Amino acid sequence: MEYMSTGSDEKEEIDLLINHLNVSEVLDIMENLYASEEPAVYEPSLMTMCPDSNQNKEHSESLLRSGQEVPWLSSVRYGTVEDLLAFANHISNTTKHFYRCRPQESGILLNMVISPQNGRYQIDSDVLLVPWKLTYRSIGSGFVPRGAFGKVYLAQDMKTKKRMACKLIPVDQFKPSDVEIQACFRHENIAELYGAVLWGDTVHLFMEAGEGGSVLEKLESCGPMREFEIIWVTKHVLKGLDFLHSKKVIHHDIKPSNIVFMSTKAVLVDFGLSVQMTEDVYLPKDLRGTEIYMSPEVILCRGHSTKADIYSLGATLIHMQTGTPPWVKRYPRSAYPSYLYIIHKQAPPLEDIAGDCSPGMRELIEAALERNPNHRPKAADLLKHEALNPPREDQPRCQSLDSALFDRKRLLSRKELELPENIADSSCTGSTEESEVLRRQRSLYIDLGALAGYFNIVRGPPTLEYG
């Protein structure tokens, strides 16, 4: 995530206000406010045209000049996956300049949780868009969060009341791959794509929202995760990867910010770098992924397979158990702006595995980080690993985050007088006065308490890392 300074006093005041708003209350207020007002008009940003000689571009532009309707661009409607992919290919093959001439929004919807009205789906009248509340970081009011590929908003359909994540991508940066994988492959551990709508020169992707934030947000706010929490997350991630890999899909960007908490599961997000292999080995034309989690074979760019995701998961496990990505402690970012050479020469980062890691979990991480991809286990094999299937007596009583929250609420009710007054706040502050032992003893029960409305630690879906 990047932060861009605006230097505007007015913007500072707005950001400061947003940081203290309750998103649920804002949505309720705005819903009542706009009920009797005229729909707001969406103003597309003015962007310069990028000339292109692509034949599809020329065809679309000639139709626009002649005043004829272009397929997929006449309205917002329900459709099939094939319709959505055709829509995505069409808008990615037409220069953004011509979308400024469109009289209204257009798009394809896959799920009826989004309810267009007479072929229209307008901001503020049909759907509300609210910036994510920044719940974890105190970054100062002079900064605006900005993701690498687009901004993400909390969206609520005014008719169905469904709350969603809405990712905004400038049309000149939009690629069909941004929707292909989520549209074509449905699984409980993959964030569901509800549809895509083009407003002006910005594509809006509506998808399933995670109530509990991302793994990265939890790590940055509350420190390292306990091993049973890691087991819970890892099993859900591996189920998603097992499904993707069975379809020969490489995610290419497994990392904490792309794993998002739901109340009863964890899901994978951000498939913009994903590819579906046609052969046993994928030969890349570019470097894909986040380098700190990249496998050695990905860095070499000589071909890799779905096993690259397994290595990235191993690096992610180190991050979850230590609170720090691999390599960073031994090679500070200030001295090493790139880790590609280090990974190429020294991988795997076994020295970064937590000192208090159990033997079983250490064995699993070492297997996932095997340098030779041919010796690296598949997702299905790791799901059977004993580290992820401890004896019943060693497992926590909770089988989901919701049941965990209920158990924790009862415990806190009984021992309320014994708890420090600032326990909820301290779990988010990351105070240096606390010992590492106490930080690791905290569990997802408290950290994700807001899922059931018990605490105010995590509020709503993930921020800009959601993808």
Swiss-Prot record:
| Amino-acid positions noted as binding ATP in the UniProt annotation, renumbered to this chain | 144-152, 167
GO CC: one term?
Answer: cytosol
What keyword terms does UniProt attach to this protein?
ATP-binding, Cell cycle, Cytoplasm, Immunity, Kinase, Magnesium, Metal-binding, Nucleotide-binding, Phosphoprotein, Proto-oncogene, Serine/threonine-protein kinase, Transferase
Q: Tell me which species this is from.
A: Rattus norvegicus (Rat)
List of residues that carry Phosphothreonine: 80, 290
Q: What does this protein do?
A: Required for lipopolysaccharide (LPS)-induced, TLR4-mediated activation of the MAPK/ERK pathway in macrophages, thus being critical for production of the pro-inflammatory cytokine TNF-alpha (TNF) during immune responses. Involved in the regulation of T-helper cell differentiation and IFNG expression in T-cells. Involved in mediating host resistance to bacterial infection through negative regulation of type I interferon (IFN) production. Transduces CD40 and TNFRSF1A signals that activate ERK in B-cells and macrophages, and thus may play a role in the regulation of immunoglobulin production.
In which tissues does this protein get expressed? Expressed in spleen, thymus, liver and lung.
Q: Which reaction does it catalyse?
A: L-seryl-[protein] + ATP = O-phospho-L-seryl-[protein] + ADP + H(+); L-threonyl-[protein] + ATP = O-phospho-L-threonyl-[protein] + ADP + H(+)
Does Cytoplasm show up as a keyword for this record?
yes
Keyword Kinase in annotation: yes
Which biological process, per GO, is one annotated for this protein?
cardiac ventricle development
- MF terms (GO), sorted A to Z: ATP binding; magnesium ion binding; MAP kinase kinase kinase activity; protein kinase activity; protein serine kinase activity
State which gene encodes it: Map3k8
Q: Which InterPro entries has this protein been placed in?
A: Kinase-like_dom_sf, MAP_kinase_kinase_kinase, MAPKKK8, Prot_kinase_dom, Ser/Thr_kinase_AS
Please state the Enzyme Commission number of this protein.
2.7.11.25
Question: Where in the cell does this protein reside?
Answer: Cytoplasm
Give every Protein kinase domain span.
146-388
Q: What does UniProt list as catalytic?
A: 253
- PTM per UniProt? Autophosphorylated.
Q: What is this protein called?
A: Mitogen-activated protein kinase kinase kinase 8
Family to which the UniProt record says this protein belongs:
Belongs to the protein kinase superfamily. STE Ser/Thr protein kinase family. MAP kinase kinase kinase subfamily.
Q: Which SMART domains match?
A: S_TKc
Q: Which cofactor does it need?
A: Mg(2+)
Q: How does it assemble?
A: Forms a ternary complex with NFKB1/p105 and TNIP2. Interacts with NFKB1; the interaction increases the stability of MAP3K8 but inhibits its MEK phosphorylation activity, whereas loss of interaction following LPS stimulation leads to its degradation. Interacts with CD40 and TRAF6; the interaction is required for ERK activation. Interacts with KSR2; the interaction inhibits ERK and NF-kappa-B activation.
Chain positions found as Phosphoserine: 138, 141, 400, 443
